[in-house]
Amino acid sequence: MSAKPTTLYDKIWNDHLVHEAEDGTCLLYIDRHLVHEVTSPQAFEGLRTAGRKVHAPEKTLAVVDHNVPTTDRSKPNPDPESAEQIAALAENARDFGITYYNEFDKRQGVVHVIGPEQGFTLPGTTIVCGDSHTSTHGAFGALAHGIGTSEVEHVLATQTLIQKKAKNMRVTVDGQLPDGVTAKDVILAIIGEIGTAGGTGYVLEYAGDAIRSLSMEGRMTVCNMSIEGGARAGLIAPDERAYEFLKGRPLAPKGAAWDAALRYWDTLRSDDGAHFDHELKLDAAALPPIVTWGTSPEDVISVTGRVPNPADIADEAKRLSKERALAYMGLTPGTKITDIKIDRMFIGSCTNGRIEDLRAAAKVAEGKTVNANVNAIIVPGSGLVKEQAEAEGLDKIFIKAGFEWREPGCSMCLAMNPDKLAPEERCASTSNRNFEGRQGFKGRTHLVSPAMAAAAAIAGHFVDIRDWH
């Protein structure tokens, strides 16, 4: 009798299941643990108090990213609390024997950029981090998701995690993406379709021609924002594109171990006939460049559209929520998206801070000048991304056009470091969240692709990137 068809999520889950209790609570083995300075101090302190060691330091990688300044690092950190957290991570990594990339190491960067870059992220592995955007690593066919600080301590101590199994959802995007439409637009469109709660209780598997055609950078962008759709994690089955990206990376398998890994990785795809609890299909050809207008990632609209009118929403709670969003964003229903002016622009983050993103922005910026009323910063996702961009001359293009070229870090994605919006400043951002106060107190965030962000910085307002050239 042939085995029951199985989803990719089920395969990875079953390979890592240590124990399942009668109530469905499971103990899962964790292959990789990424650590940063914000969610780890209490976890390490818990280990010290209990007299425990890190169970598998070789499967743990630490990096500073959230609090680190992206300007001159030869000067002291201006925020004492941030400086304390950075110093604590360095001390904890040293005391517990964990590999650590500090702010002066060229391998340093945003945790979800450096994992794949180093080959620490591998197909078929379970990966956790005290950060919600750990779902990024699902682009390689890894089961990856964020955990809380108490869970960080549990994984450090045991290399296992207690959780319940999620349901399966498949999101299929078929067809070819039009010019000017990117992976960022794909995931924003998906979130707009299912809402920020639509993926709750699910692991999303992305499939279809449009997904397969994406670069690894693009796939990481899609999986990165799975959490904004409410999902536990996002997955894309690994293929030759993933293998090519990983081959030769410092921490990837070598020689016979690589060949053995490939044989296993080739099994990591959902079987024909595997059951999904929910299916969603999108037509890639119908997708436009997208701009968010509100304070939730589900508040999406085509760049050619107008700010919607909440009065058209029948559900009272949702209507009031969208009215509040418009008031916070300082927008009027019916306003053309291309008439919305910006004050700031941010290209970077674990969503869009990779070399492909910087190349796309440089293509838009070359020979142009940033609008006099806009402050625009570009923050590479890692020191190695920065090094590669500079080798390609992208930094010169940006600086000549009037963009600020920064050091790697989380930067303006979140208001935990000096890169913040002032109250009521409006930002075109390539990050992943547009919540109230996310980029600074009363700051106004519009989520867009790197090319759309660069074009807005130059024009001073949102423009349809399809008309740019």
From Swiss-Prot:
Its EC number is 4.2.1.33. CDD domains: IPMI. [4Fe-4S] cluster binds at C350, C410, C413. GO terms for molecular function: 3-isopropylmalate dehydratase activity; 4 iron, 4 sulfur cluster binding; metal ion binding. It comes from the Bacteria. One of its GO terms (biological process) is L-leucine biosynthetic process. Pathway: Amino-acid biosynthesis; L-leucine biosynthesis; L-leucine from 3-methyl-2-oxobutanoate: step 2/4. Keywords: 4Fe-4S, Amino-acid biosynthesis, Branched-chain amino acid biosynthesis, Iron, Iron-sulfur, Leucine biosynthesis, Lyase, Metal-binding. Its cofactor is [4Fe-4S] cluster. It catalyses: (2R,3S)-3-isopropylmalate = (2S)-2-isopropylmalate. Binds 1 [4Fe-4S] cluster per subunit. InterPro entries: 3-IsopropMal_deHydase_lsu, Acnase/IPM_dHydase_lsu_aba_1/3, Acoase/IPM_deHydtase_lsu_aba, Aconitase_4Fe-4S_BS, Aconitase_4Fe-4S_dom, IPM_dehydratase_rel_enz, IPMI_cat. It holds the Pfam family Aconitase. Heterodimer of LeuC and LeuD. Belongs to the aconitase/IPM isomerase family. LeuC type 1 subfamily. Catalyzes the isomerization between 2-isopropylmalate and 3-isopropylmalate, via the formation of 2-isopropylmaleate. This is 3-isopropylmalate dehydratase large subunit.
